[in-house]
Amino acid sequence: MDCSIKSAFVNAGFGAWYPKGSERLERSMIYHGCSHEMLFTREPFADMDTSKPYRIKYHALKKAIEQGYTHIIWLDCSLWFTRSPNELMDKLNHDGGFFIQSGYNLAQTCNDNDLVFGKLNRDEAELLPEMWTCIFGFNLLTDKGQKCWHYVEQAFNVGVFDTPRDHANGSADPRYLHARQDQTAVSLAYHLSGYDCAFPPNGIVADYKDNEHSLLFRQGL
């Protein structure tokens, strides 16, 4: 990669099982020859409100950016690698972002306030795929990558990361099912930034033993 690139995989988690999953993930990355920085945190950030746990991804990404990293991929504690993580960073460098569709659309996972932030109506949102945030990344050396982080920050500031996990009267529209906090925020940022590089679900990542050819498995502890 270019010498101006500073790349990192980011993970954070605290509580009962998240640190154990984080350790499992780290071991798999070392075993399979990760050649990029691994910024792993297993305790709450000092400026984080622990009563709002979905904020942790924002704080972890912000810290990486403040440290000067340009190519950043977030990884959930439920993941582990079956081969080299370097494949992901190569994809990120080539495409300017790394995202995987969840199988939902944004009409299903954005409450009314989220749609206001995204400047969308629900008919428009129904045409836009939601992204997973168990794994995603952006390249800040690109215009789209910079825009993506800008919109993630805006989403954090207006409370998209704090929406209730259940329906909680988020919309009277029957298409709305539930909000997804960080997943909603990143999905809106993806579309607002003009990205068009998302992979379909269940290819790169699969539930444990569902697809032996997947780069990552996903399973809680």
Give residue ranges: language-model regions.
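N-terminal anchoring/stem segment of glycosyltransferases
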Residues: 1-70, 175-180, 193-194, 217-221
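Extracellular/periplasmic catalytic domains that process cell-envelope and extracellular macromolecules
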Residues: 2-4, 92, 127-130
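Residues that flank catalytic or metal-binding motifs in active/ligand-binding sites
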Residues: 5, 57, 75, 130-134
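A generic structural motif
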Residues: 36-44, 99-104, 160-167, 203
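A structural signal for short, well-ordered beta-strand segments and their strand-loop junctions
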Residues: 37-40, 73-76, 98-100, 137, ...
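GT-A fold catalytic core of metal-dependent nucleotide-sugar glycosyltransferases
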Residues: 57-112
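Short, flexible, basic/aromatic active-site loop/helix in glycosyltransferases
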Residues: 115-126
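Catalytic core and acceptor-binding pocket of nucleotide-sugar-dependent glycosyltransferases
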Residues: 126-221
